[in-house]
Amino acid sequence: MVNITIDNHTIAVPSGTTIMEAAASIHIPIPKLCYLKDINEIGACRVCVVEIEGQDHLVTSCNNVVEEGMTIYTNSPKVRRNRKHTVEMILSQHDAQCATCVRSGNCTLQTVANDLNIVDSPYKKEICIEEWDTRYPLVRDASKCVKCMRCIQVCDKIQGMHIWDVSGTGARTTVGVSENRDIKTADCALCGQCITHCPTGALRERDDTDKLYRALEDKDTIVVAQIAPAVRAAWGESLGLSREEATVEKIVDALRRIGVDYVFDTTFSADLTIMEEGTEFVERFTNGDLDMYPMFTSCCPGWVRFIKSQYPQMVNRLSSAKSPQEMFGAVMKTAFAKKMNIDPDRIFALSIMPCVAKKDEREKPLFHGEFAGHGVDCVLTTRELDRLIRADHIDSKTLKDAAFDTPFTEGTGAGVIFGATGGVMEAALRSAYYLITGKNPEVDAFKQIRGVNKNGWTEAQFEIAGNTIDIAVVSGLQNTRNLMEAIQKREVHYHFVEVMACPGGCVGGGGQPIHEGKELASDRGSNLYFLDKTAHLRFSHENPDIKHLYDEYFGSPGSHKAHQLLHVQK
């Protein structure tokens, strides 16, 4: 242990503890702007400086470790003056039009400046302006960049994509797309992790709420919404609702108040995905197609973008099943329209998703032949949903639980856990077991695949009707790259692999609410598993609305019509 004094508090901390960590252990907060534990500890912002007795210069607390006998002052007059000057200089290069920024009220720079009682910026403004195609799902505003390097480090260390890099020198230093590439050709997976780790509004998703408003204003348009599983685990966080209060049924109420005509749960189409993907897996496994390389899940568009750009030779190993979002879009424009006697051209299909890449997925024409067109018309992230609710002046405390609309009311616990890493695989195995044996397994027979082991992915082996099935589950694109390399080198072999681009799965998606310095994917995922545990239906193949859909429209999983509408044509 190391004995130190911080702001007149004498404490002992383990060797190797940083000054910032030592201060936090006795509830002394030190302001910071660029720091992300274990990811970005470079002291670039110099907001976290402290004074050490006997030293002339101030030191950054995020990356300097304590030493025996140190006396540290976190808020001495010298520290206060320096810290305030540093933030004022940062503000001189920052477009501080906070009232029109999506991060207003949830901006680390804004919080630090307010806490330092900065009411004016005494320095000449030198704002960096760079062109960016704001039609792209990911938007970067250079005028709000504070050069913290978080986006670079997250993209490099966690996702392994190296999309961002430093450019320029000295006062002209900035962050941009690496190698001076255009973002549209830079192989970005659109995972959005750079957005959720940015301390300001320099990175954000394209806002599509106006597109929804235009549809709502058109009296001839019928707006049909779907809500993804992971959204229910996070939407209430920035609206002051506890997890117990923030039910998915209250989102239904909010959307109806806004003017949406029909609201459905994407867990329904997650169950539909399981029926199609599970059937495909059983067929490919039985035919020996998986003896050498696995079948990969295809519901995560960030992962699909990744495999297409990084491992194009493996694209044919993807399941042909569309994602739950796109399956529901297809069902809305066909089976739903037919059942409700609605002209499909009048339907505006809205998705509420935890994901930035879903905006890009929507733009891909995934219908074919007589069904050519787009299934989904607009995708809003969880953050956009929250902004939508506030823009309509809806007090979240007044929301009531409202039921989903018919004819697709039911969703199972298996569909709910799609939002957490391992959930798709677990749901698929529950139904694959039934498809192979004609019997249900123990409902939690496959729960060992939840979580991540030291290799960065989880692997397991199951026996089903005398068949040995090897599976793997991975989230985060650097982990995914490591797994793909191991598969290609034949170091490992699996029959079925689930991949999620975002760490922790959709619950940690790039469109989820942002909390400075906190990673909430695990907590949100636990919430989804609780909802599964308490659901009255936990097997996708037992969903009565899924059974009715097949009986009335598709015939059976894997049928010709199902392949036309629910699968990507390879």
Predicted regions and their residues:
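Mobile "lid/hinge" segments at catalytic clefts and subdomain interfaces of large enzymes
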Residues: 162, 195, 385-389
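Iron-sulfur-associated redox domains of electron-transfer enzymes in respiratory
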Residues: 15-69, 75, 79, 206-570
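Residue-level recognition of alpha-helix initiation/capping sites
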Residues: 14, 136, 146, 189, ...
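A short N-terminal beta-strand-loop micro-motif at the entrance of redox/enzyme domains
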Residues: 9-15
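Short glycine-rich or small-residue beta-strand-to-loop segments that form or flank ligand, phosphate
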Residues: 7, 138-141, 226, 499-500
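A generic beta-sheet turn/junction motif
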Residues: 6, 168, 464-466
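Fe-S ferredoxin-like electron-transfer domains
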Residues: 46-190, 196, 203-218, 222
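Eukaryote-biased recognition of intrinsically disordered, low-complexity regulatory segments
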Residues: 1-9
